[in-house]
Regions:
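Non-transmembrane "mature" sequence context
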Residues: 1-117
């Protein structure tokens, strides 16, 4: 379960929105295209902010994979990565997830690359 307050979409809803089967969703988690979290009840899901409306329907937030990879390389667990994404960072003056959804992924990734444990 994540320690930050976020809206979580259940995995079946994510699969429906993306038009994929659950096994493909698991691959997206492994490839760090999406990140899996648990809601308050312990059910698996995906943060709502990382599924966005694209030109061809719903899709994973395009800039998320690079950031998740950097955070994993820095030693972050999935839960730590979610906490970092959803907590205001002084260097950004906002939450990294907000910067990513606004197209400022270069700045987010520059900061993420300095976070190695």
């Amino acid at each position: 379960m994540t320690s930050v307050d976020i809206t979580v979409l259940p995995t079946d809803e994510v699969c429906r929105l993306l038009g994929i089967e659950e096994r493909r969703l698991k691959q997206l988690f492994r490839d760090r295209v999406l990140i899996e979290v648990r809601d308050g009840s312990g059910a698996r899901g995906v943060p709502q902010d990382v599924i966005v409306k694209g030109d061809n329907g719903w899709e994973p937030l395009p800039s998320l994979q690079g950031t998740l990879t950097l955070l994993a390389d820095d030693g972050f667990t999935a839960e730590e990565a979610v906490a970092w994404l959803y907590t205001v960072q002084d260097e950004l003056g906002e939450r990294p997830i907000d910067a990513l959804t606004s197209g400022r992924h270069h700045r987010v990734n520059r900061i993420a690359s300095t976070l190695a444990f």
